[in-house]
């Protein structure tokens, strides 16, 4: 039984998107509260992963989720910054989580995600995008430009030394459950953590159901709850087969980014992928699942297929900007087919849990 049924919610992360300092240029607290209400009341989640860089936004969003009786998995993200800054940022987030916990909130903390890629100094590459390219140096890229090849096994001691320090910082400021969200290619010592999180969308290619079950099942030997921290795929035919590179279908060399030829929007296929994976994850023994992601404002929807960046997005809602070309424009959201399919599935699981006497 998937005890946690959630969605990931980006409050704005300092990725280099080319559309502002954070991945959410527009931030409006009332809009955020409306989106969190959609997550609790219509998507039928009982959990939400709140991640991002700005601590005030994290606090606002976590509070809104708690007010709607959602479990919050708080995940601070600080990309391409020195380790001491990352640790200070984590400590602040941990203190926030502890404050919420003491008020009776259901809150857990993760010390971050995919640090081999997000954090400099652990593998070759000066920037987030360069490190990502290097991890997948042998894959087919359109956007990424590898500058080296990464030996993830050789990088494991550096990663685990970093994670051990992060766990100490987290536990020094927070008394609840502490975890980490790892990409499948990261070789992690899970001893310092209460839960195992898998950033499942980082698989380099599509897998068979048996391969998925074997992968998730391989983590059960740690005797800790295994959570699918994030998973999803984009909104076009064949996206699942591209694995992690579902997003790599946009020509960004032009002034106006355009979807490459040969890709057809298909909301139904995206929805079917999620339903299939829910069954696989439950059969494999996962304790919870988080769909990635609720909204992706840097990828707005357009009725022009060439401009429809939402096609390359995992988001469950379309971002429809007032001014398509302006990242700072206001917007409205419109649920996609995957939203409705997931809502029905989560509602069904919730009814099953109630029938079994669960929470």
Feature names for model-found ranges:
Residues 172, 176-178, 182-184, 189-259, ...:
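Glycoside hydrolase catalytic-domain groove-lining segments
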Residues 3-9, 46-50, 72-76, 107-111, ...:
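Hydrophobic faces of well-ordered beta-strands that scaffold small-molecule active sites
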Residues 35-92, 151-179, 309:
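Aromatic-lined substrate-binding rim segments of carbohydrate-active enzymes
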């Amino acid at each position: 039984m998937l005890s946690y049924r959630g969605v990931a919610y980006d409050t704005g992360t300092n990725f280099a998107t080319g559309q502002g300092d954070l991945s959410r240029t527009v931030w409006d607290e009332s809009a955020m509260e409306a989106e969190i209400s959609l997550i609790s009341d219509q998507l039928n989640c009982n959990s939400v992963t709140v991640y991002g860089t700005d601590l005030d936004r994290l606090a606002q969003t976590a509070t809104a989720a708690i007010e709607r009786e959602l479990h919050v998995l708080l995940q601070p993200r600080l990309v391409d910054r020195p380790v001491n800054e990352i640790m200070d940022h984590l400590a602040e987030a941990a203190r926030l989580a502890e404050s919420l916990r003491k008020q009776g909130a259901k809150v857990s903390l993760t010390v971050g995600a995919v640090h081999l890629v997000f954090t400099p100094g652990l593998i070759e590459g000066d920037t987030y995008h360069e490190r990502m390219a290097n991890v997948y140096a042998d894959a087919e890229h359109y956007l990424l430009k590898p500058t080296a090849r990464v030996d993830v096994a050789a990088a494991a001691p550096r990663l685990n030394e970093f994670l051990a320090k992060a766990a100490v910082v987290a536990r020094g400021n927070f008394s609840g459950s502490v975890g980490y969200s790892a990409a499948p290619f990261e070789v992690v010592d899970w001893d310092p953590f209460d839960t195992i999180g898998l950033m499942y969308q980082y698989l380099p290619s599509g897998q068979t159901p048996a391969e998925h079950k074997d992968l998730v099942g391989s983590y059960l030997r740690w005797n800790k709850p295994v959570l699918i921290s994030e998973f999803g795929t984009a909104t076009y035919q064949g996206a699942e087969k591209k694995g992690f590179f579902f997003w790599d279908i946009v020509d960004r060399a032009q002034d106006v980014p355009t979807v490459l030829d040969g890709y057809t929007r298909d909301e139904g296929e995206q929805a079917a992928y999620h339903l299939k994976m829910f069954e696989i994850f439950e059969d494999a023994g996962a304790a919870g699942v988080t769909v990635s992601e609720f909204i992706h404002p840097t990828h707005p929807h357009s009725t022009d297929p060439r401009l429809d960046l939402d096609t390359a997005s995992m988001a469950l809602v379309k971002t429809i900007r007032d001014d398509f070309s302006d990242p700072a424009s206001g917007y409205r959201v419109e649920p996609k087919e995957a939203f409705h399919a997931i809502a029905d599935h989560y509602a069904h699981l919730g009814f099953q849990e109630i029938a079994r006497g669960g929470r």
